[in-house]
């Protein structure tokens, strides 16, 4: 990992010293994401309530530039420019993305599934459809005991993904099916959420710096 990328994680624990207890797991998550993206994989993420909002937030940071400039490569620009005026517009305006899927956007699927099948399996079905070997699955649950998130993690693990959990102090049952367990040292929901945001911001900054930074 580049020193500048590692510095993002060091800055996290400097600002939030309580996170030192899980700093190794946070770094492991960043390393796995870098490996995943470099090998053509994707991040699949889900949660409930505020954790669903966090999942969407993570996707928003990675699908476009977060803090780094992400200009297209010369080859990408050339390929787009072959499509005339619209291609030139795309070549000038698009940014290099990182592929992330939040399992919260398919309203027609999720409502149909919840109406016709077991609602606890809605994320698992979606993950099973999308996850491939080498991907990373991130399950976010403050308690670690969200059944639908745990089942999705299990489905993703069966597909060959590296599974990561972002939880509160106990880790819950989600931690049992996770290859990497980030258990922030709080037990109240809102306090857990207050630590989840800086964790995933730091990971996104680290990954972006590694892949796009100078």
Regions inferred by a protein language model and the residue ranges of each:
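Generic N-terminal amphipathic, Lys/Arg-enriched alpha-helix
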Residues: 1-20
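Hydrophobic alpha-helical transmembrane segments of small proteolipidic membrane proteins, enriched
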Residues: 14-17, 27, 42-43, 157, ...
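Structured helix-beta-strand junction loops
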Residues: 39-40, 177
């Amino acid at each position: 990992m580049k020193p500048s990328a590692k510095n993002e994680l060091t800055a996290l624990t400097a600002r939030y010293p309580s996170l030192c207890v899980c700093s190794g797991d946070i770094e492991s998550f960043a390393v796995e994401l870098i490996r995943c993206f470099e090998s053509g994989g994707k991040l699949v993420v889900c949660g409930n309530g505020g954790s669903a909002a966090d999942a969407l937030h993570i996707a928003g940071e990675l699908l476009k530039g977060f803090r780094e400039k992400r200009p297209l490569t010369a080859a990408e620009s050339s390929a787009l420019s072959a499509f005339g005026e619209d291609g030139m517009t795309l070549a000038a305006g698009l940014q290099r993305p990182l592929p992330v899927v939040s399992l919260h956007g398919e309203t027609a699927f999720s409502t149909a599934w919840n109406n016709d099948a077991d609602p606890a399996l809605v994320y698992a079905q979606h993950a099973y459809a999308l996850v491939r070997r080498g991907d990373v699955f991130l399950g976010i649950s403050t308690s670690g005991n969200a059944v639908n998130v745990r089942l999705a993690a299990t489905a993703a693990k069966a597909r060959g993904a590296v599974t990561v959990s972002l939880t509160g102090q106990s880790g819950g049952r989600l931690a049992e099916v996770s290859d990497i367990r980030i258990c922030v040292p709080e037990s109240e929901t809102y306090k857990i959420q207050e630590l989840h945001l800086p964790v995933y911001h730091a990971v996104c900054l680290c990954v972006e710096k590694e892949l796009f930074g100078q």
